[in-house]
Amino acid sequence: VKTLKDAGFKKLIVTAKHHDGFCIWDSKYTDYDVKESGYKDKNGESDILAEISKACTDQNMDMGLYLSPWDIHEPSYGYKDENGQPTTPENDKKDYNEFYNNQLEEILGNPKYGNNGKFVEVWMDGAKGSGANAQEYNFQKWFDTIQKYEGKGVDGRDADCMLFGAEAYTTVRWIGNELGIAGKDTWSKSKVDKNANTINSNKQGNATVGFEDGNQWTVPEADAR
């Protein structure tokens, strides 16, 4: 983190859980985490997210949280009956939305995570894998949880937590590629429909260029791999 700070970086977004479902903190909601891997730091703790958070706090580096909604490992993902077979939402035996919300609470509600206990952005991604599209996300519940801990006015915060990949609630949008390339002319607004929970950021070629007359401010964020 010090190297990033010295290089001029202002924020670090840490991948606490990617699509594979593996958690880099000791989550009480799954055994697919860093503790079960046998990893321990010099103090005998199994919590990489806490280690990174401490480093960001020491360097006063803003933190963002990447917590993938798509979870290949979690049995409650999708709609399944008591035998684990695909079913309809009303017959679903385990609520994945509650599982994900519990993990949000577990991280955002714990002061040892984040820069001095704070996250300025939650990166939710937008991916759903093959066979997983039936899972509908309860975005409103999740966003209420995020802003409860990270919203404007909470412990002196002067702005709401930024949201990436949050459909119509997005305030930080994907630029449209993983090449670090943005359009020459890019507007910082998208067109969203809260009722349909959709967002249109005007994809042209390999980049989203936004709209001059959009109805929601969505900061375009470029990433490269």
How would you describe each model-predicted region?
Residues 1-225:
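Mature catalytic domains of secreted/periplasmic carbohydrate-active enzymes
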